[in-house]
């Protein structure tokens, strides 16, 4: 039995590898905007869990005897749920809005095994630093935050601009290792079952 990661995220892969797991990588290609639109103002935690499940669903037919994991993260800032900024301009706009504020990074998890699902969401509070306009511009131009939920990464250049985290730091990187462990336990599996 293997652990299949329905993601192309190098950060999620890195977390699993650092945790002793050699995941099977099966990047999921879903229309996130269409999934969100179909939810009709669902609560933020439901939105990220539904996106995580949609990603995992793309891999279960190919891996019917394995554990399939899907994840999705979005930033809840001032009541708005924000995904990836995609452009330098949008990244700059978001950083100017979020600097000096607290926000919640929501990471939804959907784990499938043996025809059953376990879904849950982790909320971690991020305190963004009072970042200068010059640093915001330089960070956006680096390209690092363009494809990251909330327009930031905890690792790499983004580490300069996060003043504090309250909650699970691995969820901020994209996959809560403690939550994944609890999901595996619900299936009667252990984390160590997947160690290489």
Ranges and model annotations:
Residues 2-4, 41-196:
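Anionic-ligand binding patches
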Residues 8, 28, 114:
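Cofactor-binding loop segments of dinucleotide-utilizing enzymes, especially the Rossmann-like FAD-
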Residues 24-33:
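A short beta-strand-loop structural module common to alpha/beta enzyme folds
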């Amino acid at each position: 039995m293997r652990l299949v990661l329905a993601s192309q995220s190098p950060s999620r892969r890195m977390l699993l590898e650092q945790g002793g797991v050699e995941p099977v990588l099966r990047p999921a290609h879903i229309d996130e905007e269409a999934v969100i639109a179909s939810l009709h103002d669902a609560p933020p935690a439901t939105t990220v869990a539904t996106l995580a499940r949609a990603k995992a669903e793309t891999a279960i037919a190919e891996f019917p005897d394995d554990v399939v994991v899907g994840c999705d993260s979005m930033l809840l800032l001032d009541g708005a749920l924000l995904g990836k900024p995609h452009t330098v301009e949008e990244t700059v706009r978001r950083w100017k809005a979020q600097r000096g504020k607290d926000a919640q990074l929501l990471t939804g998890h959907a784990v499938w095994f043996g025809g059953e699902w376990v879904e849950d969401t982790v909320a971690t509070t991020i305190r963004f630093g009072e970042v200068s306009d010059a640093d915001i511009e330089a960070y956006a131009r680096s390209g690092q935050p363009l494809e990251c939920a909330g327009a930031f990464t905890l690792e790499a250049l983004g580490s300069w601009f996060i003043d504090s985290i309250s909650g699970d730091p691995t969820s901020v990187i994209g996959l809560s290792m403690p939550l994944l462990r609890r999901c595996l336990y619900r299936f009667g599996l252990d984390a160590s079952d997947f160690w290489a």
